[in-house]
Amino acid sequence: MNKRELESAIVTDFSKRMSYGDYLCLDQLLDCQHPLSNPQHHDEMLFVVQHQTSELWMKLMLHELQAARILVQQDKLSHCFKILARVKQIQRLLFEQWAVLETLTPSEYVEFRDVLGNSSGFQSHQYRSIEFLLGNKNAAMLAVFSNDADKHAALKAILEAPSLYDEYLLYLSRHGLPIPQECIERDWTQPYQRNPDLLPAFKEIYDHPQKYWEAYEMAEKLVDIEESFHLWRFRHMKTVERIIGFKTGTGGSSGVSFLKKALELTFFPELLDVRTEIGA
C-alpha cells in the first residue's frame, strides 16, 4: 500500500504547544504577499516572492557579515571561516534565484510593471548595508532613506564604521605585517581605494601560507565573496536586460547601463592584484 502510517509518538495536539508555524510566524510571513495589479496578474506573485525571499537571504547574509567583522576586531580570524563559507553559499542561492525570475517574459512583466511605481531594488536597505559592510561606501546613498529615520541611522552607522576589509587590514597591522598607514588611518565613510603599497604584505602572506595560515585563509574567503558578488551583479544585469531590455529602471536609473557600471566595482582589489606577483 502506497501509504506511510503516522507514528503514535508524533505530536498532533498543539493547543498548548508551540507548532512549526508558531515558531516561524508563518501566518504573518505568508500574509506579506500582496500583488497590486487589478485584476491580479498571475506572474506578479512570482515577482513579489522573488524579491521577498532575496531580502530574507540578505538578512542572514548581513547577520553573518556583521558577526564576522566583530570576530576580526577580536583577532578571532579562524572563527570567521565557517561564517564566510556560509555567506558564500547564501550568495550562490541568490545567484541561482535569478533563474526563477528569468521565467518571467517581457510581455508578461509589462502587464503589471506600472504598479511598482518608483519602487526599485536600488532602495533595498539590506543590500546597501551589505555593500557598505564590504567597503563599497557612498554617503549619497543615505538620501534614499531620508524618510525613514531608523534605516537612515542604521546605514549611517555602517557607513562610519570600518568595513570588513578595513578590519582585516587592521588585524594584519596588529600582527606585524607592513600595512600602509593610509590604509588603516583614513575616513571610513569613503570607499576603499586600491593601494599598490599594500601588495608586499599580501605577497608575504601568499609566499608563506603556513606561517600566516589564518591571514591566508581569510584572504581566500574574502576572494570567494568578491567573486560571488561579481557573478551576482552580472546575473542581475543580464536578467534585467532579458526582461526589460534597455528601458529606464522603475527607480529612475538608466537600467542596464547603470547596472553595468557596478561590474567595475571591487571590494578587495589588492587580493586580486597580488596574484600577478606570486611566484614572480
Curated annotation (Swiss-Prot):
It catalyses: L-tryptophan + O2 = N-formyl-L-kynurenine. Its EC number is 1.13.11.11. InterPro entries: Trp/Indoleamine_2_3_dOase-like, Trp_2-3-dOase_bac, Trp_2_3_dOase. Pfam families: Trp_dioxygenase (PF03301). It is an enzyme of class 1 (oxidoreductase). Substrate binds at residues 47-51, 109, 113, 250. Its cofactor is heme. SUPFAM superfamilies: Indolic compounds 2,3-dioxygenase-like (SSF140959). Binds 1 heme group per subunit. Keywords: Dioxygenase, Heme, Iron, Metal-binding, Oxidoreductase, Tryptophan catabolism. One of its GO terms (biological process) is L-tryptophan catabolic process to acetyl-CoA. Heme-dependent dioxygenase that catalyzes the oxidative cleavage of the L-tryptophan (L-Trp) pyrrole ring and converts L-tryptophan to N-formyl-L-kynurenine. Catalyzes the oxidative cleavage of the indole moiety. Belongs to the tryptophan 2,3-dioxygenase family. This is Tryptophan 2,3-dioxygenase. The lineage of its organism: Bacteria, Pseudomonadati, Pseudomonadota, Gammaproteobacteria, Enterobacterales. The gene is kynA.
